[in-house]
Amino acid sequence: MRLVGNDPNLQGGIRVKFFLDTADLAEIEEAASWGALAGVTTNPSLYAKIGGKLDDFHNHMKRICDIVGPDCPVSAESVAMTRDEIVADGRKLAEIAPNIVVKVPTMVEGLAATHTLAAEGIPVNMT
């Protein structure tokens, strides 16, 4: 999508990517139907807000991936707190679908886990 405004500083236009921050499947389906969805970000807290249980979070991520398709990244957050737990959870999340991006908390343990996951070729982002 290309947006151009009247501001002279935006003469070349700006690139905008629309990432939806939700765990609600109906919201994701609607946004995907617009044709402008660049990705989905979610976490267990958002999943809990729609009545989801932590032990079903990985299955729910699979359902999201099925809705958006393989070319749309889905950031799924690990709730683990130690490096080893984050790495283990990140590996499990990455096995769900090729478009999963493991979202890791920005903390010392998360930084160490990110290094390991990225070295294994697992897409990672930090929040």
Residue ranges and their predicted role:
Residues 2-15:
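Short, Lys/Arg-enriched N-terminal segments with co-localized hydrophobic residues
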Residues 16-20, 24-28, 34-36, 44-123:
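Active-site beta->alpha loop and helix N-cap motifs at the rims of alpha/beta catalytic domains
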Residues 41, 125-127:
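Short hydrophobic alpha-helical runs that function as membrane-insertion/retention elements
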